Amino acid sequence: RWGPKEIQQLEKDLEGEIDLLWLTGELRLERPSLEAEIEWGLQFYKTSIIEALPRVFESYDDAVKSVFGNQDIDHFDLRFHSWIGGDRDGNPNVTSEKTLFALEAAKEMVRSIYSGSLTEIASQLSISNKIMPLSESNFVTLNEIIRLRSGDPESLIRRNPNETFRQALTAMNQCLDDGRYKYVNDFIVDLKTIEAGLHSIGAVNISEK
């Protein structure tokens, strides 16, 4: 929690932002294109919505556990929708091509967010097999990710020897960047495999970050 001085500084910063908004002129002097509107709408996901999701899920988990006890629970589903680029019945400028652009832009946004997260996690997850050996089954499943998802698994293994988790995450990122994940569920299964591997060595707190 923030102390009194931190709260005071945050309030001061917020007041400064409000003052700046009041003193700022019109950002657009002409009507934006539909493509610009689509990109602008997606910025809300990048800058706030996606970042807030883990806290939403954590609050949900805590609430369920407080009622039903400490048991495995499935997350509730959140599905995002946007009318920008898809309001085919109300905007004559929205053509099939514009809707396709909106879909591709959203797809690329999600891919870039996950790719950035995988890069960050892989840079930090320096667990060594020499210090904490994996069970045979977890070692096999993680290496299956490396073999299937990486374009060059041998060089990946040489670059990060004895760091199976980092290798697997990097392989997943390569697959994501290359567009080789055919189905969302394949990506989810790989993430759950990483999570199961971390749980198997007692690194539950690390898996929850």
What are these regions (language model features)?
Residues E15, D19-R31, D77-D87:
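Core alpha/beta catalytic barrel or barrel-like domain that forms the active/cofactor pocket
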